[in-house]
Amino acid sequence: MDTPFIYDKHVTGRYFIGRRSECMILGNLLKAGEHVSIYEPPKTGKMSLVHQTLFNLRNDGHQFIVAFVDMLNVRTLSEFLIKFGTSVMKSVASTPEEYDAMVRDYLDGTHFVFDRVRFATYEELVSLNWNPDMNDVRKMLELPVRIAQVKGLPYFVVLKEFQNLMNADEYD
């Protein structure tokens, strides 16, 4: 039986109905630089809300950078840091040379490297050459802030499936 409901695509533009007040509130919070967490049951339109809000902000002339970090199957701190860094860097760079320069410039003094083989094989822009320490965590989480300062634009990071962090051994 066919179902009229589509669950695997985000709804935006003229197809987006309802939740207008939530879009306005989320947009105002983002413009004010606030951190926002949206936690609802699966398939309730969270990502459609986020996409529509970003769409509205762009239509209103706001410039910003956004990275979507898909945390599905993230089970360790290392996996999180690699996915986070890869998504953040992909939002502002597009060539191996740019990725390599970003790791050198922004993640200096850490255990992160740009490994061309891992990039070609797994599309990972950052790799760890040792177990991550607190300096690695700090520098990686500061990466969007540092990029925003250099670019002079707000930077939004959307963590999809962030509850998976609770499954990491290092969560406690």
Protein language model features and the residues they cover:
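P-loop NTPase nucleotide-binding core
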Residues: 32-35, 40-44, 48-166, 171
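A short, basic N-terminal segment
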Residues: 1-36
